[in-house]
Structures are given as structure tokens and as C-alpha cells.
């Protein structure tokens, strides 16, 4: 048997073993207050004492950046730079009830939610706070699809992956109560044929299940910032309201290396920080922020950067390309009687679509980006928001600069939703399944009128097409009613911008660790994977340095 074939077989067997380990859910976090113990080593970027030399500088205190910085600080001096502020200044970020409020709050340039409209004309948001997206999202937690790892171009230590998930889950993940509306929607998914019933599980598997949540059963949010508590307070410094303007590079172009960063504080003053020998700059600024910073620093398409008068440090045609966002299509139903508000805890998973629902109280101000545009009609009573997500997707766009010098000016974003016909076909399948869902006995009590089919429901916005065989009507529905799922990824892909250790190709001491690294979602709700990724890469870096130091020691001993 050929060596390559044997390697594939061994890898698949390893995946199966890991899958069995996944199935045994270990103890998760307990209900508790959000743990802000780490604030003792958080500083405002105006503090000039932060300027200096570090072993590692991590740019972006978000989903991957927080666990990465905490892990590296176990052995080395680390500076974590975050453009936003801390959650204590915005207490609504810390509760499940505050999820919609955070999207409603006007963007003043400092609030946790930064608004933007993509060039597709669709409303979107991104995080601007320590903890990143984990502070503003819907709290859904799951592990990656077990097949995802073999598609990434990375050689994973799957035992370490499993232990790293547990490290995250022990701190910030709970088993949620099966809230009344979530229980109803779960019964509906099963009755509509999204089988089997997988009970409670963190695994991404076909079927219906109750999954983990970063909201505990008191409604308190837990998030990536709490993982900073696992860092060494003697080694870890966190600077908030620090906008990194540019990565600094060595003057030796034949041995190009990242040596530090320039960042600006909230007063507009500029600061510098540097990395020591064998240290690294690691960019974890997210799918939008990371390619933007690379481009501003001179890493990207040569002719494009030159046209903006940006000095080209390392040409790479793929920086900012292959940008993805999963389309979200939905229906909104008004039940005849009020339903309690709930966040997403039940998932319906198929290979060609993922389905969830949340229930909401009425509001007079629309949560920005929950609906495709601000002109969408407003609910006057409690309603159910029932969603179908397209996996992948295959359609992709790009990040381009809106300013060649100011990182605080948001870049231009285009996702090209449904430009790939497979994505559109998957949307049609998903929306037809929502039609099946509406026809179930589980949802019968939520009709406003006792008539057959789906006409008995009161809809907010566009109703679902009645004729399940009319693909053209469903395609039109998908195209005309697409919204953002906020699951941005790509822009700095492994194999195109990064090597298989997440190093930027052609540059020493520079890595990227965040959602910009892969061209597809690891699962239906990716925050679990990217929390794991930060810790995982941190451990890999510590292991690399340990091996290097041991080799140097052995050489010295032999002399």
C-alpha cells in the first residue's frame, strides 16, 4: 500500500477516535458572574508605559486573540492590543436580554457594535470591544465539523484540539435550559425530517440537537475576554482603545521580518511597541481587520498597493481576496399569543442548510442588520425569527481599502451573495424545509388562523412562497430577502497568504490567527472553533520554542 494512502487511512481513523471523544460531553462551566479579574492588567492605550519590547504582540483582543495571548503569557511577555474598550462600560453586552439592544444602539465610533453596509447593499456589524464577536453575538457554541480538519491544509494534533476545546468549555460554555420556544422549534425540526434527534451535544452532526451556549442559565454572557484570566498576570499586558495603524518591518529585505507595530490611542497620539529576538507579531484582528491591516502595512497585491502609494513590503495577490459571509434567509411569524424571548440553543443541521430560530419581544427601533435593511417593517408584538443558513458558502468577494493611511476608516466589503449557483440551490432547499416546518403539528398552535398549509401564519415581512415545487419563486425569495449571518471568514487564507503554521508567506515573525484564515465555515456557528484556534496555535508556538531552546541547549552541551 502506498505511503500516502496509508496516511489518509490513519488520519480518518484518528478522526473517528476523536469523534467518539467528542460524544462524551465533559463538565461545562457553571452559572456565575462574568469574571473581570483580568482588569488588573488592562490599561488604556494612552499609557506610555506600554511602549517597549515584548516577546509577542497580539493585534486584536477578540475570539482568537484573547485565548492566544493568555496562552503565550504562560511563558513569555505579551502585549495584547484591542481597538475597542471593555465590557464594563457597556453592561448591556453582558446579558442575553442585551443582544438586541446592542444592535439597536447608535454607532458613535466607540460603541461595541460597529455598523457597516457591504457593497452588496446589506447591513452588517462587527465587534469593537475586548472579547470581540463573543461579546455581541447570540452565544451559540459548538465544535467544528469533524471533516473540517482534513480540508484545511493543516496537520492537526487532534488530541490537542480536543483538550483545547475542553479548556475553553470549562471556562465559558454551559448546557442551556431548553427554553419553551426552543423546545417547540426542536420538535418542529424533527417532525419536518431533520433527523436524528441528537439530544444535547456540542458536535456538528446531521440532525436536531440542543447545543452549548455562552449565555448561562441566568442570562449572563460569558466570552473570550474571560479567558484572559488564564494568562500569567506578570507576563500579560492588555491595551484597550489601541488602533494598530501599521506593522513595522526590518530594513533587511532579503531577510524580511516583522519587528513591531505603530498604534494610536483615543487621543490620536501615536505609540510604538517592538518584539524581541525570536518574538513575533500575531494578527488576530478578524476577517475584516486583518486583511485591512496587512494591506495598510504593504502586504498585498503589488499593483493595487502601488496605485494607492503604499510601499510594497511583500507582494501577495491574495490578501483581501476570497472573502466569505454565509447568507441568512428567514421568515418572521407573529403567534396569536405572546411567546417568551429566547436566544438560539437548538440547531437543525443538514449538509445543504443549517436552521435555527430565536424569539423576540417587540421593538420600536430595529436591531441593525437583523433584517436586510433599516426599511424593513417593525414588529408590534412578540415574534419568531426562523432562519436558514447556507453552509460554506462558495460565493466570495473581497476587502479593499477605503483609506490608504487610516485604519479607523472602514474598508470596502463585498460578499457577492449567491453569485455561485450552488449557494442559491442550497438556499432554496433550506427555505423549502422551513415550509415543511411550518406545516408540522408542533407549530400548529402558533398559527393566527385555522387554515391548511402555511397561510394561517401572520408574517412580518415577505411570506414564504406557498408552492413548494416552484423553484423560481424560492430563488427570487432568497435573492430579494438575503441578510447577513455575520459569519465572516477568509481574506488571509492558509495556502495563499499563510503557510500551514499560520505564518505570513515571505515574512518572518508574522502570523495570522483568526477567522480570516479559512475559506469555509468550520460548522454552523464557528465561535467555538476560533476560540479553540487561539489556544491551539498558542500551544503550538510554545512547543516550537521549547524544541528550539532544547536544541540550542544540546548544542551548547556538546561543545
Swiss-Prot record:
Disulfide bonds: 427-478
Signal peptide stretch: 1-27
Cofactor section: FAD
Keyword S-adenosyl-L-methionine appears in the UniProt entry: no
Active-site residues from the entry: 487 (proton donor), 525 (proton acceptor)
Keywords annotated in UniProt: Disulfide bond, FAD, Flavoprotein, Glycoprotein, Lyase, Signal
Subunit record text: Monomer.
Family designation: Belongs to the GMC oxidoreductase family.
Protein name as catalogued: (R)-mandelonitrile lyase 1
Protein species of origin: Prunus dulcis (Almond)
Lineage, top ranks: Eukaryota, Viridiplantae, Streptophyta, Embryophyta, Tracheophyta
Amino acid at each position: 500500500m502506498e505511503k500516502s494512502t496509508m496516511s489518509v487511512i490513519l488520519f480518518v481513523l484518528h478522526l473517528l477516535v476523536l469523534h467518539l471523544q467528542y460524544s462524551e460531553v465533559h463538565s461545562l462551566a457553571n452559572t456565575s458572574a462574568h469574571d473581570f479579574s483580568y482588569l488588573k492588567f488592562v490599561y488604556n492605550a494612552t499609557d506610555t508605559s506600554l511602549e517597549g519590547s515584548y516577546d509577542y504582540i497580539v493585534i486584536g483582543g477578540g475570539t482568537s486573540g484573547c485565548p492566544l495571548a493568555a496562552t503565550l503569557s504562560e511563558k513569555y511577555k505579551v502585549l495584547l492590543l484591542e481597538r475597542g474598550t471593555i465590557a464594563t462600560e457597556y453592561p448591556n453586552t453582558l446579558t442575553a436580554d442585551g443582544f438586541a439592544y446592542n444592535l439597536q444602539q447608535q454607532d458613535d465610533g466607540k460603541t461595541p457594535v460597529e455598523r457597516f453596509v457591504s457593497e452588496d447593499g446589506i447591513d452588517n456589524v462587527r465587534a469593537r470591544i475586548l472579547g470581540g464577536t463573543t461579546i455581541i453575538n447570540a452565544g451559540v457554541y459548538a465544535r467544528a465539523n469533524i471533516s473540517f480538519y482534513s480540508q484545511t491544509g493543516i496537520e492537526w494534533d487532534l488530541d490537542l484540539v480536543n483538550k483545547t476545546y475542553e479548556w475553553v468549555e470549562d471556562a465559558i460554555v454551559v448546557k442551556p435550559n431548553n427554553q419553551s420556544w426552543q423546545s417547540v422549534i426542536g420538535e418542529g425540526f424533527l417532525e419536518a425530517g431533520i433527523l436524528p434527534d441528537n439530544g444535547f451535544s456540542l458536535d456538528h452532526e446531521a440532525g436536531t440537537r440542543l447545543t452549548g451556549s455562552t449565555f448561562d442559565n441566568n442570562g449572563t454572557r460569558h466570552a473570550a475576554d474571560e479567558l484572559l484570566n488564564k494568562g500569567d498576570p506578570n507576563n500579560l499586558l492588555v491595551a484597550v482603545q489601541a488602533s494598530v495603524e501599521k506593522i513595522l518591518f526590518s530594513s533587511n529585505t532579503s531577510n524580511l521580518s516583522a519587528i513591531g507595530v505603530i498604534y494610536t490611542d483615543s487621543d490620536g497620539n501615536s505609540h510604538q511597541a517592538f518584539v524581541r529576538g525570536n518574538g513575533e507579531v500575531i494578527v488576530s484582528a478578524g476577517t475584516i481587520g486583518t486583511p485591512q491591516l496587512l494591506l495598510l502595512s504593504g502586504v498585498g497585491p503589488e499593483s493595487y498597493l502601488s496605485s494607492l502609494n503604499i510601499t510594497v513590503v511583500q507582494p501577495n495577490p491574495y490578501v483581501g481576496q476570497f472573502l466569505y459571509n454565509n447568507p441568512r434567509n428567514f421568515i418572521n411569524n407573529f403567534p396569536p399569543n405572546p411567546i417568551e424571548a429566547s436566544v438560539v440553543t437548538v440547531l437543525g443541521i443538514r449538509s445543504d442548510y443549517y436552521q435555527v430560530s430565536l424569539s423576540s419581544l417587540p421593538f420600536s427601533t430595529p436591531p441593525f442588520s437583523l433584517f436586510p435593511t433599516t426599511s424593513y417593517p417593525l414588529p408590534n408584538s412578540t415574534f419568531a425569527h426562523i432562519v436558514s443558513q447556507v453552509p460554506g458558502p462558495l460565493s466570495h468577494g473581497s476587502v479593499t481599502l477605503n483609506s490608504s493611511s487610516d485604519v479607523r476608516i472602514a474598508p470596502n466589503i463585498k460578499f457577492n451573495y449567491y453569485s455561485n449557483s450552488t449557494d442559491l440551490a442550497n438556499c432554496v432547499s433550506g427555505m423549502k424545509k422551513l415550509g415543511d416546518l411550518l406545516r408540522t403539528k408542533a407549530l400548529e398552535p402558533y398559527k393566527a388562523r385555522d387554515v391548511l398549509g402555511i397561510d394561517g401564519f401572520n408574517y412580518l415581512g415577505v411570506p414564504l412562497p406557498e408552492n413548494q415545487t416552484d423553484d423560481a419563486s424560492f430563488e427570487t425569495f432568497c435573492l430579494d430577502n438575503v441578510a447577513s449571518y455575520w459569519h465572516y471568514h477568509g481574506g488571509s487564507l492558509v495556502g495563499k497568504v499563510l503557510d500551514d503554521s499560520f505564518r505570513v508567506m515571505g515574512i518572518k515573525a508574522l502570523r495570522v490567527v483568526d477567522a480570516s484564515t479559512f475559506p469555509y465555515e468550520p460548522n454552523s456557528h464557528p465561535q467555538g472553533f476560533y476560540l479553540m484556534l487561539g489556544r491551539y496555535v498558542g500551544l503550538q508556538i510554545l512547543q516550537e520554542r521549547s524544541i528550539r531552546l532544547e536544541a540550542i541547549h544540546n548544542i551548547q552541551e556538546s561543545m
